[in-house]
């Protein structure tokens, strides 16, 4: 459950000031989840960072720089994180009579939704950001890069301007990937401490969207639980005018959506899918209730969650993601609950494991790319 940072303060008069009515509705929703036996995956920061409505759209528009800000432990983003974690985890729920941090209903906590999307743009943000509000963050990145090089007894050099495939990559670009991965470690450890100090003892996840191996190395060092997000036939511009998506079957592509998500799974670690769906505009949408849930059950994943709302009070047309407005997606949700949740498909007895040596990550910009599509097919084996 995320975007709470765009709900509980939105109608208040100040940023980081609770709207009592909205916060009560959130507390009641937690209670109802518990009554229905639903486990909760909670995201602390997502898009609006507990801003009131006059500032919320501006914060949303700057979502990538704000992710970078949290990555480099910028005070603006860290303060918003501390606020959200304190209110959501440490408040005694008037309906359940306990803190969420102590409630077995809470399955896992994500620090910042799809954090590494910001990490993808660190080098371009550093060189081309023109917003004066983020100038101090640019300076912070430059100082962190210098410190990183000094710790390795390396000569100072500029932040790279690009990272790409092919023979034009320099050793500096490979080094910069290590730098970004290290910064993700630092932000994870900082957020982890905040949550542990509040008494949360369960799973903490981060870097849930990108399939780049470099982010997997950070997950491996930091967390015993891995989460991933992904969509089949994700529209090119979401639901905006001119958006396009492809019209092939997910079965035809040998379940590439599942294989892509499963490729970030790590041996011996709990694995969950915090967001997945089969987009509305793809004519094979009815496959969304069978292909992904069945394979996730077959491979023994711990949890899966459709994106997004199973119920919506808005009177709007069918969208690409909202289950509430789409009867086919609603049916897919039921089938997913049967195949995965009820256990109609049992996990395979064997798994294929792909070993990625550290030497591979040091070669060129290998770390910048995901697992090869052919290699990801081990997810279909048993």
Q: Can you say where each PLM-predicted feature lies in the sequence?
A:
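Active-site mouth of glycoside hydrolases
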Residues: 1-193, 197-223
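Short, charged, surface-exposed secondary-structure boundary motifs
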Residues: 235-241
């Amino acid at each position: 459950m995320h975007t709470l940072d765009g709900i509980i303060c939105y109608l208040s008069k100040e940023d980081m000031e609770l709207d009592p009515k909205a916060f009560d509705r959130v507390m009641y929703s937690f209670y109802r989840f518990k009554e229905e036996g639903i486990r909760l995956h909670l995201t602390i920061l997502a898009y609006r960072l507990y801003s009131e409505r006059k500032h919320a759209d501006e914060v949303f528009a700057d979502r990538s720089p704000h992710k970078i800000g949290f990555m480099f432990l910028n005070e603006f983003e860290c303060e918003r994180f501390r606020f959200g974690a304190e209110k959501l985890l440490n408040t005694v729920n008037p309906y359940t009579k306990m803190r969420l941090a102590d409630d077995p209903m809470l399955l896992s906590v994500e620090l910042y939704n799809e954090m590494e999307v910001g990490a993808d743009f660190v080098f371009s943000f550093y060189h081309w950001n023109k917003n004066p509000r983020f100038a101090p963050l640019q300076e912070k990145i430059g100082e962190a890069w210098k410190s990183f090089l000094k710790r390795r007894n390396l000569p100072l050099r500029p932040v790279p301007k690009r990272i790409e495939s092919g023979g034009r990559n320099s050793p500096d670009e490979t080094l910069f990937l290590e730098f970004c991965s290290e910064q993700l470690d630092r932000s994870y450890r900082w957020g982890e401490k905040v949550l542990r100090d509040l008494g949360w003892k369960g799973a903490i996840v981060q870097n849930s969207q990108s399939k780049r191996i470099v982010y997997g190395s950070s997950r491996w060092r930091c967390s015993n639980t891995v989460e991933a997000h992904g969509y089949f036939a994700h529209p090119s511009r979401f639901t905006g005018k001119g958006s396009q998506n492809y019209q092939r079957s997910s079965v035809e592509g040998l379940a590439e959506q599942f294989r892509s998500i499963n490729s970030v799974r790590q041996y011996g670690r709990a694995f969950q899918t915090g967001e997945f769906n089969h987009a509305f505009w793809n004519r094979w949408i009815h496959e969304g209730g069978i292909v992904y849930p069945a394979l996730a059950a077959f491979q023994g994943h711990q949890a899966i969650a459709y994106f997004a709302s199973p119920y919506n009070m808005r009177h709007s047309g069918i969208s690409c993601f909202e289950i509430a407005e789409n009867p086919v997606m609603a049916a897919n949700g039921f089938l997913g609950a049967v195949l995965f949740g009820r256990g109609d498909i049992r996990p395979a007895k064997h798994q294929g494991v792909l070993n990625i040596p550290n030497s591979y990550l040091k070669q060129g910009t290998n770390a910048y790319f995901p697992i090869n599509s052919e290699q990801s097919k081990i997810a279909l084996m048993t």
